[in-house]
């Protein structure tokens, strides 16, 4: 312990108190983001530019995650868009927009939620811009995808999974003679 007149102070460097210099705080964040795969098709050009019918937009998305190592996970936001009319497809865009996420000292539940809810929420505006630019570059109006509530979808999926597990455990009676 330092005296009052001493310049040195007690920095509480006791390793048992966690002051060992190790980074043991919970952390999650992006390392980088990138287009992993992209396909853009305009299969009926140039005739498509003469069509008058409003296209139907079919949008599908999926979230994937791959562990790169113990602390890094690649999160993939997969978006497929097809604009079509009775005459055929105007355009087809398939995009896999990914990000490397660093996660350290988080519980499994928190890490899972970050990977499948928060990371896609952060990636989506960038993927949305890529889709808008691609449709514009195809010669059409930019397609501005509506925001997606990834946190709400994540919570809904957890509730659905819990209900399925509860139904599977006690809801069925065994077959056979009684």
UniProtKB/Swiss-Prot annotation:
Subunit details? Homotetramer, a dimer of dimers. One homotetramer interacts with 1 SecA dimer.
Entry GO MF terms? unfolded protein binding
Query: Know the name of this protein?
Result: Protein-export protein SecB
> What Pfam family is a match, any one?
SecB
Q: Which domain of life is it from?
A: Bacteria
- Species of origin reads Erythrobacter litoralis (strain HTCC2594)
InterPro entries linked: SecB, SecB-like_sf
Please list the GO biological process terms of this entry: protein folding; protein tetramerization; protein transport
Q: What Gene3D superfamilies does the database record attribute to this sequence?
A: SecB-like
* Function per UniProt: One of the proteins required for the normal export of preproteins out of the cell cytoplasm. It is a molecular chaperone that binds to a subset of precursor proteins, maintaining them in a translocation-competent state. It also specifically binds to its receptor SecA.
């Amino acid at each position: 312990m330092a005296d009052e007149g001493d310049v040195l102070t007690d920095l509480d460097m006791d390793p048992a108190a966690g002051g060992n210099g190790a980074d043991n705080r919970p952390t999650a964040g992006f390392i980088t983001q990138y287009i992993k795969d992209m396909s853009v098709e305009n299969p009926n050009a140039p005739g498509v530019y003469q069509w008058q019918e409003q296209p139907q937009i079919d949008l599908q998305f999926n979230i994937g995650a791959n562990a790169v190592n113990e602390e890094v996970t690649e999160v993939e936001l997969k978006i497929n868009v097809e604009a079509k009319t009775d005459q055929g497809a105007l355009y087809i865009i398939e995009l896999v927009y990914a990000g490397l996420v660093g996660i350290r000292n988080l519980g499994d539940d928190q890490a899972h939620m970050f990977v499948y809810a928060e990371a896609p929420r952060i990636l989506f505006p960038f993927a949305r811009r890529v889709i808008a630019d691609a449709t514009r570059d195809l010669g059409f109006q930019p397609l501005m995808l509506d925001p997606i509530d990834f946190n709400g979808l994540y919570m809904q999926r957890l509730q659905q999974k819990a209900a399925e597990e509860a139904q599977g455990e006690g809801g069925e009676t065994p077959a056979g003679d009684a």
